[in-house]
Amino acid sequence: MPRSLRRARNDEGWGAGMSVPPRILAIAGSDSSGGAGIQADIKTITVLGGYAMTAITAITAQNTLGVSAVDALSPEMVAAQIDACVSDIGVDAIKIGMLGSPAIAA
């Protein structure tokens, strides 16, 4: 569990008056321009008061004019990222965006 979330926890659970943000896992592609994908998900989750975690499915080369390249990660790498978050931090909600390939969706 990240230090920011660990700090609020005591032996009986969450400390009196401590508000733990919802833990949101965003599964999506990475947009190099920051206008969409994981980058936009992190911004939105943070503004809404959540704790953002990510599993990157693909890396894109894009800007305001369009997408020029996409490179999907392996399903094993995506699964490893998801497991790393779920097994340690826990997840309250999942947001799914671009999966990158049919193999990742399977």
Q: PLM features: what roles do these ranges have?
A:
Residues 8-13:
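A cross-taxon signal for low-complexity, glycine/charged-rich
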Residues 90-106:
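Membrane helix-loop-helix hairpins that form the core translocation module of multi-pass transporters
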Residues 1-5:
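N-terminal basic, low-structured, amphipathic or hydrophobic segments
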Residues 14-93:
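Small-residue (G/A/S/T)-rich helix-start motifs and N-terminal tracts that mark the onset
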Residues 6-7, 27:
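Short linear motifs centered on Gly/Pro in flexible linkers and helix caps
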